[in-house]
Amino acid sequence: MEHHPMIETSTRWPSPAKLNLFLYINGRTENGYHELQTLFQFVDHGDELTIQANHSGDVTISPEIEGVPLQDNLIWKAATALQNYAHCSFGAHIELHKVLPMGGGIGGGSSNAATTLVALNYLWQLNLTDDELAEIGLKLGADVPVFVRGFSAFAEGVGEKLSPANPEEKWYLVVRPNVSIATADIFRHPDLTRNTPKRDLETLLNAPSVNDCEKIVRMLYPEVDKQLSWLLQYAPSRLTGTGSCVFAEFSSKSEAETILAQLSDKVSAFVAQGRNISPLKETLAEYQSASHRPI
């Protein structure tokens, strides 16, 4: 068996959250998909994956997520999709250290899938490009390519047109109201705004940021409305994605932490800084540098 420096080595990889700093719905395509303009930014807070590549050919994950069969786990789906795409016979054991809420609108599952693709592409030495990994990722979820590419991005169309963006790296207080929101229900709602005019990124960055889904989510989910109303007393605040997470923006960590301290202990919340280069990209570069392989 050939020598493979990364096999049986335990490695740690971040799986960061994202925020939609704005989200506009511009119309619908002929096949019913919504056309969007949205700005993705990563934050320096998220899950962590400990990954050990091996020769088994199998992908194992711990801990098991209650109520989610292995075949439905996005980490497993990402790893096996990569195996199939690259005709790869290596395996891996992946341990998920879960911090981000499921279904919160901050990209937890999509980020896990992207971290799996990026890490195993490196550990299995497949040398696939970001374009190839993003193509695999798109079949797993619409937001996966953003996490794979690892740069803040302005997304258009049905979310597939990505261009790099460089918004200010502010501090955020992210709060998760204790409700689960089905994205499909929001996009199907008859009162959803679907005719916001398209604008270029520079115009959008200089205009007040809005999430077109927010009005409907606040109407349907009183917990979200209550939390947003509370945050808006202190700072510009809005919904990310279709929720349920909401966020307030601040110019300093201390300001954000002061407001966090006023929240009830029963409320799930965290403070994080926006990052235009994903912590995942930075970790990959560190591993590549340490092994003297070109980036």
UniProtKB/Swiss-Prot annotation:
Key words, A-Z: ATP-binding, Isoprene biosynthesis, Kinase, Nucleotide-binding, Transferase
Record family assignment: Belongs to the GHMP kinase family. IspE subfamily.
Summary of the function given for this chain in its UniProt record: Catalyzes the phosphorylation of the position 2 hydroxy group of 4-diphosphocytidyl-2C-methyl-D-erythritol.
The protein's annotated pathway: Isoprenoid biosynthesis; isopentenyl diphosphate biosynthesis via DXP pathway; isopentenyl diphosphate from 1-deoxy-D-xylulose 5-phosphate: step 3/6
Protein name per its UniProtKB record: 4-diphosphocytidyl-2-C-methyl-D-erythritol kinase
Annotated GO MF terms: 4-(cytidine 5'-diphospho)-2-C-methyl-D-erythritol kinase activity; ATP binding
Tree of life domain: Bacteria
Active site: K18, D143
Enzyme Commission number(s) from the entry: 2.7.1.148
GO BP of this protein: isopentenyl diphosphate biosynthetic process, methylerythritol 4-phosphate pathway; terpenoid biosynthetic process
InterPro entries (UniProt xref): GHMP_kinase_C_dom, GHMP_kinase_C_sf, GHMP_kinase_N_dom, IspE, Ribosomal_Su5_D2-typ_SF, Ribsml_uS5_D2-typ_fold_subgr
Catalytic activity: 4-CDP-2-C-methyl-D-erythritol + ATP = 4-CDP-2-C-methyl-D-erythritol 2-phosphate + ADP + H(+)
Source organism per UniProt: Vibrio parahaemolyticus serotype O3:K6 (strain RIMD 2210633)
Ligand binding (ATP): P101, M102, G103, G104, G105, I106, G107, G108, G109, S110, S111
